[in-house]
């Protein structure tokens, strides 16, 4: 009797163990299938969109079939982060799958593909995701989709009419650098539109402050500089950056080559506007600015900087403004250009540059500066 009871207990234990193993198998299998579906652009069992109608991740399209409309949605699973900074968030246990998913996502997210163009209804759902979700990887995916669509002129008006500008601008308050960069890219694409620029001007001061205080040479800083450059293509909003010009010169001196070129594009927009000439001349410039004129510096950096100086020199009448020169402080760009001999020594230092265009630009700049600053001494 005791032996039969032992056999019964063993049998019961085996049955319970087998059942538990099966449950664990089904659970892990279900998770794996959900991940594979999301990697293929399908739907997962995630719900983070709040109460917004149609903003569920498995409800991008009104149809349940595999139509072209549903294929046009770009889905970025949590382990398929795009960009160099996103690698820190990749899941170690899914590294191989993440690589495959990332390639598939990047292919589908190509701006050259018509599959990424969303309808107004789909754009509304994406905006609803941006507004309601708090998860970084969901925000990043939605912002990438918006950025791709904002590259098309006809979508810029649609996104604005759907209330997308303040929704995306609100993301600028996030501390996540990846999400913040994607939001700046969306706003940059939208800012090509004149009406969008008029509405985005209220965020310029915030973008300017964030750009200056961001980590040097970071993706967020570069994205902010690109947006500010777009916003200053016309003269209408350039005055809003007047108090930050000194900071831009500081970024120019301290930044790497990519940052230097982006700052120069922004300063060139300002230098072409005669109304901004005094603000540029008032700006404090680092003492290291002159050291940029050397043969080792990038040719494009030298040429753009010389063009900026030429524009300022052309727009500012040195003789007419001589009585007001005391309004420029020591260390300003005005005194950098006023000290002709020092500036000449710096520029003459690259006259032996092997590039012919650099030599021509240097000669042109020196002649103009001498003519405008010392007209009487040349008579």
Swiss-Prot record:
Location of region: Mitochondrion outer membrane (MOM)-targeting sequence: 1-6, 26-37
GO biological processes: axonal transport of mitochondrion; mitochondrion organization; positive regulation of transcription by RNA polymerase II; protein localization
Region (Nuclear localization signal): 89-98
UniProt xrefs under InterPro entries: ARM-like, ARM-rpt_dom, ARM-type_fold, Armadillo, Armcx_regulator
GO CC annotation terms, alphabetical: axon cytoplasm; cytosol; mitochondrial outer membrane; mitochondrion; nucleus
Transmembrane spans: 7-29
Quaternary organization: Interacts (via ARM domain) with MIRO1, MIRO2 and TRAK2. The interaction with Miro is calcium-dependent. Interacts with SOX10.
Descriptive protein name: Armadillo repeat-containing X-linked protein 3
Region entry Disordered, spans: 95-116
Keyword terms: Cytoplasm, Membrane, Mitochondrion, Mitochondrion outer membrane, Nucleus, Phosphoprotein, Repeat, Signal-anchor, Transmembrane, Transmembrane helix
């Amino acid at each position: 009797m005791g032996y039969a009871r032992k056999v019964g207990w063993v049998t019961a234990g085996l049955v319970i163990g087998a059942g538990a193993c099966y449950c664990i198998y089904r659970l892990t299998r279900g998770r794996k299938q959900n991940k594979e579906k999301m990697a293929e652009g399908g739907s997962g069992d995630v719900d983070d969109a709040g109460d917004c109608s149609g903003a569920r991740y498995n409800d991008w399209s009104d149809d349940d079939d595999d139509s072209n409309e549903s294929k046009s949605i770009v889905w970025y699973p949590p382990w398929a982060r795009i960009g160099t900074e996103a690698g820190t968030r990749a899941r170690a246990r899914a590294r191989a799958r993440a690589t495959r998913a990332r390639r598939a996502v990047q292919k589908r997210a190509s701006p050259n593909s018509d599959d990424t163009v969303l309808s107004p209804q789909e754009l509304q759902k994406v905006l609803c995701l941006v507004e309601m979700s708090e998860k970084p990887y969901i925000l990043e995916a939605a912002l990438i989709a918006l950025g791709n669509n904002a590259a098309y002129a006809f979508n810029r008006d649609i996104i604005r009419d759907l209330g997308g500008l303040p929704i995306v601008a609100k993301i600028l308050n996030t501390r996540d650098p990846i999400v913040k960069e994607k939001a700046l890219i969306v706003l940059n694409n939208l800012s090509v539109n004149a009406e969008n620029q008029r509405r985005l001007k209220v965020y310029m001061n915030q973008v300017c402050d964030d750009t200056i205080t961001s980590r040097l040479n970071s993706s967020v800083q570069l994205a902010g500089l690109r947006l500010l450059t777009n916003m200053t293509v016309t003269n209408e909003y350039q005055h809003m950056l007047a108090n930050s010009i000194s900071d831009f010169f500081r970024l120019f001196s301290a930044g790497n080559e990519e940052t230097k070129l982006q700052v120069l594009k922004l300063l060139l927009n300002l230098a072409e506007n005669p109304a901004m000439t005094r603000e540029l001349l008032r700006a404090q410039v680092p003492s290291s600015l002159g050291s940029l004129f050397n043969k080792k510096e990038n040719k494009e950096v030298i040429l753009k900087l010389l063009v900026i100086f030429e524009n300022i020199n052309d727009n500012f009448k040195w003789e007419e403004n001589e009585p007001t020169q005391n309004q420029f402080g020591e260390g300003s760009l005005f005194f950098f250009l006023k000290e002709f001999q020092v500036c000449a020594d710096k520029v003459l230092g690259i006259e032996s540059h092997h590039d012919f265009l650099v030599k021509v630009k240097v000669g042109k700049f020196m002649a103009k500066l001498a003519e405008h600053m010392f007209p009487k001494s040349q008579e």
